[in-house]
Regions:
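Conserved catalytic core of the tyrosine transesterase superfamily
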Residues: 1-304
């Protein structure tokens, strides 16, 4: 018999009417240890909350696609910085949960079945080179795509995550001729950081705001029908990656900003950590890892 906490597990998450009972039944029908049961429940809740926020709709098991599971995997790895083993554990759980739903006839297919686990590899993040960035921004300018220019600029100049861009509201922006900033908010605790916006970024955001559709929404990035979710922002980024022949995703732009910042401000990990919103400076230190060529060039400069 399902326990009270299992039935109420999804409280606070926008879900369909059947979902709480389905999750409780899944947990109840498997012989999990109590501690494992709670961890699995929290993993499902984490996915449900992400789904609702990313797609701006209630979490309903029949609405989940393989694309959602792939995006969630990327969210855990790139946005939340979870270890490969932690991400893979979540994928195994989702595959089991949706597999059970499929076997019970609640969904037509298991959306997690074909999603591959991540391979263990060094975490040194890569960034775009300057020529690639110029090519992307040139294509945006040629198409006079002011919304794309603003979104890409926030990632390239302010190190914004895709969730930062989606969650940014009009009152979070301070823009004037001499300076400007954006306040990004994260998660249930409304953790926030205020990041200065360089002149090119301020100009890009201001130009977009002047043509932004006048809909009743506080969100900065909107379409004619309402605020853009993570899918909408990701589509913008991937569109210009395709145009430029680059495997482009939102977090690659954030990595690029971090690399350029350290090139111009060598060793200033504290400032970069504040901009990126890293609570652990060891995460920021990954951007200091050098390639063999860079190490060789640095060694050649030694002179006694």
């Amino acid at each position: 018999m399902a326990k009270n906490w299992e039935v109420n597990l999804l409280d606070g998450v926008p879900v369909g009417p059947e979902e709480p009972a389905l999750v409780a039944a899944f947990l109840d029908q498997h012989d999990f240890a109590e501690g494992t049961r709670r961890l699995i429940g929290l993993d499902i809740k984490q996915f449900a909350r992400w789904f609702a926020e990313a797609n701006r709709e209630k979490f309903m098991v029949g609405r989940v696609t393989m694309r959602d599971v792939l995006d969630f995997r990327d969210h855990l790895r790139r946005e939340k910085g979870q270890a490969v083993a932690t991400v893979n554990r979540s994928l195994v759980l989702l595959r089991r949960f949706f597999g059970w739903l499929f076997e019970q006839g609640h969904i037509a297919a298991n959306p997690a079945k074909g999603v591959k686990q991540l391979k263990r590899q060094p975490l040194a993040p890569k960034g775009l080179d300057r020529a690639q960035v110029r090519r992307i921004l040139r294509e945006v300018e040629l198409r006079q795509d002011l919304r794309a220019n603003a979104a890409l600029s926030l990632m390239l100049y302010a190190g914004a995550r895709i969730s930062d861009v989606v969650g940014l509201e009009l009152h979070d922006l301070e823009l004037n001729e001499r300076s400007g900033s954006a306040t990004f908010r994260q998660g249930k605790g409304n953790k926030q950081r205020t990041v200065p916006l360089p002149l090119p970024c301020r100009k890009a955001v201001q130009a977009y705001l002047e043509v932004r559709p006048p809909i009743k929404s506080a969100a900065v990035f909107v379409g004619e029908r309402g605020p853009l979710g993570e899918r909408g922002i990701r589509a913008i980024v991937e569109k210009y990656g395709t145009i430029c022949g680059i495997d482009l995703h939102p977090h690659l732009l954030r990595h690029t900003m971090a690399h350029r910042f350290l090139e111009d401000n060598p060793g200033d990990l504290v400032s970069l950590a504040q901009i990126l919103g890293h609570s652990n400076i060891n995460t920021t230190a990954l951007y200091c890892q050098r390639t063999q060529n860079q190490l060789g060039e640095a060694s050649e400069k030694l002179n006694y």
